[in-house]
């Protein structure tokens, strides 16, 4: 089992089908759910499901994670790109090693898997997931 950082394969087709709207203010609600290192997440992940083994748990963490703030997609140099504002899990006690971004408005469809590169442990502290800056080479989500 592993957490493999990737854009989910199903998401690539769903974008072309118009199933995801990332527009600031009027788009779908996307959430960030945290997972422990033993979770099995990767390109074949198609949806968020509360029954999927490996979701983090702990004080002040709710299954399903937290809502993200969309940043409207842009395009430059042949690449479409978009991201989210940084996400803060407040005053949590938990351990995690990765996350799943998913569309909670539209069937909990998976968008991408994040691997934090290490196991993170927080005890009654904020956990901040910092997204890279918006740009054709840096954004967390890019299609070239």
Indicate residue ranges for each PLM-predicted region.
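Small cysteine-rich, disulfide-bonded extracellular modules of the LU/uPAR three-finger superfamily
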Residues: 1-97, 104-144
């Amino acid at each position: 089992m592993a957490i493999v950082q990737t854009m989910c394969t199903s998401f690539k087709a769903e974008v072309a089908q118009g199933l995801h709207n990332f527009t600031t203010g009027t788009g779908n609600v996307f959430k960030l759910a945290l997972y422990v290192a033993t979770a099995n997440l990767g390109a074949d992940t198609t949806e968020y499901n509360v029954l999927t083994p490996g979701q983090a748990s702990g004080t002040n963490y709710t299954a399903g994670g937290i809502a993200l703030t969309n940043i409207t997609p842009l395009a430059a140099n042949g690449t479409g790109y978009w991201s989210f504002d940084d996400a803060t899990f407040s005053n949590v006690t938990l351990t995690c090693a990765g996350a799943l971004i998913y569309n909670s408005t539209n069937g909990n469809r998976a968008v991408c898997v994040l691997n934090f590169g290490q196991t993170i442990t927080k005890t009654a502290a904020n956990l901040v997931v910092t997204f890279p800056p918006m740009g054709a080479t840096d954004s967390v989500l890019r299609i070239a």
